[in-house]
């Protein structure tokens, strides 16, 4: 069975813990204040305000009120039916005084997330981004599904700043999509021959090529501008860097472009409130 095509972001989904720790999927329950007027979706960042959970818009990771974790649903007594209700999301302005949010608050959690170039436009991460810091995109989730639409921002260069909220730990191989074309590179430009790209590729697409012995060579470079199907020129973030002082893809090489729409990330230490000496 083929892995589903990734069509839109879904917030942060917990998958395991770093360092081989046992992941139980446990959550901590926090209060949501009566009438809180902002939707909170499954997979959203949340912070604490006077002991209550509120939705956080996290892009740079700066500020004193750091995240307490990721929202994973809630329970409350419906003001309409007077029955206990379990909900994928918190509906804004619900007049329930007993709401409890399920929050995954372990700062060592690794999450799966979708990479986007802007808002909800699915893009790609690349091998060169592993270990770097990533920004987040704040999107409004869906009241139909209850799921978040937050995403990881595809960079046009490897990030050097330490103020970004997420650290990219790995690429999700199962949803990767690869295409190939014949060509070469010079500095930050790949020139393709023949009919060019067989299909469009987004920002962040990983670049590799096939060696004479049939092995794949990772270049350490990635695409910085989306390229359409049949394009014969592709812009990359930097000249390739291959052992042996190789800085260009040889002429008539098979160049492999791999899109990784999903990544594994964790909170940067400065983002999570448990690692901060300043309380909420």
What are these regions (language model features)?
Residues 182-195, 226-235:
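Ser/Thr- and Asn-enriched, surface-exposed coil loops between beta-strands
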């Amino acid at each position: 069975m083929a892995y589903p095509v990734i069509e839109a972001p879904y917030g942060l989904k917990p998958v395991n813990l770093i360092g081989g720790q046992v992941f139980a999927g446990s959550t901590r329950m926090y209060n949501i204040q009566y009438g809180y007027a902002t939707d909170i979706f499954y997979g959203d960042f949340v912070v604490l305000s006077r002991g209550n959970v509120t939705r956080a818009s996290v892009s740079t990771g700066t500020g004193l009120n750091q995240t307490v974790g990721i929202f994973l649903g809630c329970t409350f007594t419906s003001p309409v039916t007077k029955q206990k209700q379990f909900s994928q999301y918190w509906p804004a302005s619900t007049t329930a005084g007993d709401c409890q949010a399920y929050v995954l608050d372990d700062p060592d959690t690794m999450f799966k997330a979708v990479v986007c170039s802007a808002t909800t436009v699915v893009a790609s991460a690349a091998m060169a981004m592993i270990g770097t810091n990533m920004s987040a995109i704040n999107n409004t989730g869906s009241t139909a599904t209850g799921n978040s639409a937050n995403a990881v921002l595809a960079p046009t260069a490897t990030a050097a700043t330490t103020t970004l909220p997420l650290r990219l730990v790995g690429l999700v191989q199962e949803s990767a999509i690869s295409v190939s074309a014949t060509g070469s590179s010079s500095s930050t430009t790949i020139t393709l021959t023949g009919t060019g790209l067989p299909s469009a590729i987004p920002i962040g697409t990983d670049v590799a090529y096939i060696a004479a012995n049939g092995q794949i060579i990772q270049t350490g470079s990635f695409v910085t501008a989306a390229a359409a199907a049949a394009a014969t020129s592709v812009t990359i973030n930097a000249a390739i860097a291959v052992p042996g002082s190789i800085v260009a893809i040889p002429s008539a090489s098979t160049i492999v472009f791999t899109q990784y729409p999903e990544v594994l990330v964790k909170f940067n230490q400065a983002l999570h409130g448990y690692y901060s000496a300043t309380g909420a």
